[in-house]
Amino acid sequence: MIVPRYYENLNVLHENTQPARAYYVPASCRMDDLVEHREGSDRLQLLNGKWKFQYFKSIYDVKDAFYEMGYDTGAFDEIEVPGVWQMAGYDTHQYTNIRYPFPFDPPYVPQDIPCGAYVHTFSYAKDVDAAKAFLNFEGVDSCFYVWINGEYVGYSQVSHMTGEFDVTDILKEGENTIAVLVMKWCDGSYLEDQDKFRMSGIFRDVYILKRPECAIRDYRITTSVLKEKAEVKLDLSFYQETAVKVTIEDRNGVVVAEGQAEHDGAFTFEIIQPTLWNTENPYLYTLILQSENETIVDHIAVRTIEIKDKVIYFNGQKTKFRGVNRHDSDPVTGFTVDVEKIKKDLTLMKQHNFNAIRSSHYPNAPYFYQMCDKYGFMVCDEADIEAHGPYMLYRKEDTDYNRFKKWNEKIADNPEWEAAILDRVKRMVERDKNRFCIVMWSMGNESAYGCNFEKALAWTKQYDPSRITQYESARYRNYDVTYNYENLDLYSRMYPALSEIEEYLEKDGSKPFLLVEYCHSMGNGPGDFEDYFQMIHSDDRMCGGFVWEWCDHAVAHDQAENGKTKYYYGGDHGEAIHDGNFCMDGLVYPDRTPHTGLLEYKNVYRPVRVRSFDQERGMLTLHNYMDFDDIQDFVDICYEVTQDGLSVQKGKVVGASAAPHSDCSVGLDIDVPTAGRVYLKLSYQLKKELPLVSAGHVLGFDELLLENKDGRNQTAAKWTASDVAVSDIRVEEDDAWIVLNGDGFTYRLDKRTGLFSGLQYAGREYLNHPMELNIWRAPTDNDMYIRAEWEKAHYDEAYTRAYSEQILQNKFGVMIMCHAGVVAPTVQKLIDVEIMWKIDGAGRIAAGITAVKDEELPDLPRFGIRMFLDKKLSEAAYYGMGPQESYRDKHRAASHGLFRSSVQELHEDYIMPQENGSHYDCDYVELTNQRYGMAVAAEHTFSFNASYYTQEVLTQTKHNYELTEADSTVLCIDHAQNGIGSNSCGPVVLDEYRFSENEFRFDFTLVPFVRG
């Protein structure tokens, strides 16, 4: 074999690597902007670019010493570094959540392990003032061997962590050749079973640092805040000792502390009346470490984080994490994400009210944390550890006790893995210790608990007692063993039901409660942000959480004929072991277009909320949910009064001032119209310029329904008002049909269904297909479990059959009463319905439907009617909740208004097609082509959905680019829909959002019309 089998040896994790140290970028002189532009340093030589590359399906196919000087790489391809080889067309993409993609046989991996050989030639100029050279790999999946100029340099693993080698004696002046052999898997892969696409290669930057012989090797900064000053402690270690001038400057370049250091040890500096860093004002000081031939510039902060009485305090303020779980993921470059991609993520997060990020489930590139320092995010830094696969092993006895015990004993509680687990935790802490955004060290994810994590926590707490520790998987253990949890600061949970949280707070509550993952954001959802927000803010021991997750993971291929990008998920590349579209669970699409769930989060976590509005006194009470800023310093509050969606009054709220976490009252004098649906909308706009967010950016809103004499929507009232003129409707009837002929209309009702099959008005047929009673919706990702019950009840095959009908007529119109049932093959009648149709002389159709569902059956997906309208009816105008989709539990980002949209724009294009585009709490909707249309209105609000896609097509189609349009504009008018929730990986839909009624009534009016 061409290399020693370190990749299957738990006793060899690294060879010839440097001890872990803090990340920094040195230069020959002071350079302040080396966070996002580190390539500007004259002491950092990037080796990124086009490398020679050959992919091998098996290590046994690597027969030539490709790393030797003079080896002919003419048969090699070229590949971009950094990058992953799957994105370059080699190997096969694979997405799996828990299951290992290879047999569980540690420390061994498949014998025919795929690998990639990299070769790159570069020019190197030696620097007499920086004669040392250190080769850095910031990310290689899964392990690698490296040679320079034919000479073996070393070996390393831990995919998401830096491997550094001293190559001073190997590099030569002029041309040099580096060769790297990367293995797809290694023993470390058992610890890298994260829920993501599995990709391989040199996926982060490769560079050489030029260093003086006498230079700082490592430094550590800690700060403590006293009464009117801060102490900055600097621990230094050197390769060889040298005099170092230490300077600390404030944001304006004013020196606030300085001194000298010449040897290993600790040095303390004072900052008088320091400005503390926080997420609303990320104030950084500049630290300059200047020696004879080198300068290191760092940006440091002064801040505190502590737990008192089971409550987290940041700079002395009670704090909640408004966080999100973030993977490195890009649909084109995979794991490789550069500064600009990270900055785009951080910008969107800031714009949508996040203040914290969990680096799920591995350390990010080191500059990510510098950017979080700069832009104001708290970070939970997570070790590159997930050993979830043993949870899926075969067990004869599949009980929780046995499942957790078997999971636990394989790795977490197996001393053979101690060195590997501690190595990963220590390397993370050592590299990232100077990043003040990091408030929490996480030992990893979903790896169970045992002696190895006890030791990792003990080392972390001893080394860095200034930060919080968390490890959610501590709860998965061998129940026969007593473990030590004293070094674990938080009680962390994933996706708990609200009742479970309440129980913990009531019966235990010994540690702050962290929702380390919650509100699974897969597809259309989540629908429970507001409910978790209320829980988080109900108790100071609740310290917030991290939504799962930031982005949909997908691989972008070419464009379909309809212009849509073909995004592939699990199974689309032919892989046998995969988890389908479970990777499509983000708040943004792969290209970072926001999901409606992101908008929902933003408004739920708005910085200010209305507590109450005394309309009679004109007194508004507000609560400040910010941690550090007064309302008056952070936001401008603008108000608007609307009547049936039209603006009638605007202005600015003046004098609102409330300290963090407190209330204020302020006068607001407005005129309330006597008729119409009248809403007061308050918009919270950023007052000051923030990093990444401009002044004037809207951070959220509140709306309040105001009381008046006639609160009906006046347009809806006109649509629903019956024509009292004498009508002349002729009724024709046979065994199958009832035909109504009026002045300018002919309606055809099918006696077999009790529903209309034709609506001809002003010479045009409005229905392309018969009307239906509708109980099915294309299952959302969050319906994945209840879907089985729905299909067991055959809701997806339901149709309507009528039993009897009765016609009554008077001078004002015709009434048709039908007794019908919603039925499906092989099961009992689903719903018994009584339908009453009232048709007046103007052609207006008033409907009243009384429904009784069989109590044995599961909650309904929805109930309403579905109409297949003339496709030329392509424009929608509606009064209800918009402009984005809204549901009974997912409508906090929507507001009441009069909205206009094309039918095409009403479709929310989830990559896995599903129910979408509904609008909640509507008074009316009109579908038109400007010349004629159909209006639906009601005295009691309803939901509607207008689309070119049927629910059948949405149910059956696996990708959005494969969707086929119907020949109609499909209009669904719903009495109700089941809630959205987050049950794809969370609790069931809350009771108050379930469509659990067994008896209900639905009234609405259909009005065909012609403009002009």
Language-model segments: residues:
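Extended substrate-binding grooves/exosites of carbohydrate-active enzymes
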Residues: 1-39, 96-98, 190, 294-621, ...
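Accessory beta-strand-rich segments of carbohydrate-active enzymes
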Residues: 2-15, 37-38, 52-56, 84-92, ...
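An acidic-aromatic loop/edge-strand motif
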Residues: 84-87, 92, 99-108, 157-159, ...
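Extended acidic/polar, glycine-enriched regions
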Residues: 172-175, 237-308, 678-716, 720, ...
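Intrinsically disordered, low-complexity Pro/Gly/Ser/Thr-rich segments with frequent PxxP/GP/PP motifs
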Residues: 260-272, 645-675
